[in-house]
């Protein structure tokens, strides 16, 4: 921890140039969301064995606190560089402290550190998009306390445990929901009719109560048929009106 190199001026300039090029390409056809190395807990999972990490906040809370401070602070300069370079949103990985931990554990031991990082992002005028692609339902209410403007991707069963209609009712418009078409069993392996049916079902569930953005539940799988993606987009556009 003590001797980790700091972000260099050269890295900062490289970020500015890459974001400039991407935004120039995008023009008015989209926004640019950039990833950082996760929230504090996700970041810690890259340097600490997961089995140890999941017990650390109970077995050695003092060290856990130091670790979370370290994984927060090491990310701040990079996060600021992305925002100052023009990123429209910051995507924050939060899948490692997933729903299997339960709301009580998450809120007591994880949420305070994640919230501090989320606050840092949003105090600079950039919305934070919190990402949990695994079990999520037990934490849907907890994420209201997290303060992120957006939460995604609400992976449906069997990829995760999200039931979008239930989640929308819990959130009640307190944050934007992004989700949640099954990118494996529907977009990659499904028929056009299955894509249409699932898209309509997800769209209707999502826009029932509060702001909603439809997308695949996670990144597209390799060899996803282009015609399935086109059908997903066109069906979503036809059914997007509230």
List each language-model region with its residue ranges.
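Active-site loop segments of alpha/beta catalytic cores
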Residues: 1-242
